[in-house]
């Protein structure tokens, strides 16, 4: 059930539901932690709900900046929008500029770090401001249709960033007493592995410092992701020798050689995809704010380990020329029960065998990341679940993210880390990406209430 207090367009009969919902939340929080000012919970809900339009305007500004990755462009522009808002809000803040530029643009990635509260105990709010490339330029012209805001990055995950910013602002403006602080981490480069964002911060010892928990605002379709798959992604190039089709005997066909490589990878794929994980992975969709399983879908299929071949492929120069090169990608997604290094060695071993058999090729690692998992029974996991249930009227499911998450950087340091955000995974990266602003508002309230419970005095 979607609780009405987070709607702006309530009718007269629904205002009773507002008061009732706030009372339920206040009562719940009183039971969670004795001495808690239950009235503060309802004040947080009211404060965030009143700012839906303000939040939508900020999100539209962020979506309008095409911070596409790859290649990693307009990072400076989107960072300036965020920086301006954070500074105007009066939060402690610093900007860490990369010393090196991206390979494909002149951009120098910037990590934005903010905090609210005092002490060493830190709950991290983590988000990434880069987005996947758009299918059309129109995707960077945000459109508002009632409660829905359309545009590249609205779902993944600029909408989630806005929710986190306003969660912190609500706690600040309402004078919430925290035993510790909220650390805000806004990074680039997530869509291509995170090396120049979270990876950089981790290497410099800045990520997760004094951390006791972490929340990420990824588009989770109403569930909580407490685990994620690891990844090893490669680009393989097979070489040949060019010749006119009429003289093909003088050439060496790179496409046919590539076919031999792919055949061996398909054999590995069959074995890999016979394995399953114990973690729940059933795809979820939302309809009228209710989380429902996708109909006619075998949920067990999502538990299989993954080896995808040919996400990108290409080669040759013309139909009448023997191709002198062909390339393709391999994307291996690894379940938490599997070992990244062992699976990497098996995958690379197939390519090395092909080389030994006389097939000239080379490969490049595009991304590499470990799987990770945090128990739903951790204090932060329980607090998050309780506050989702309080705001949405239904306890969330805990599932494994089918892809790679930056929660892994925190989990590797023993910090319980979870992803929960306002977007739908089914529209992320798609041609009609959008986010429901009511869900952005809900998530802002959930983040604030979770922080209040987790860090409250």
Task: Label every model-predicted segment.
Residues 91, 271-304, 308-316, 360-457:
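An extended, acidic, His-containing surface patch that forms the Zn2+-binding/catalytic region
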Residues 157-233, 290-292, 299, 455:
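Acidic/histidine-rich catalytic neighborhood of metal-dependent amide-processing enzymes
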Residues 47, 61, 65, 81, ...:
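Generic non-transmembrane alpha-helical segments
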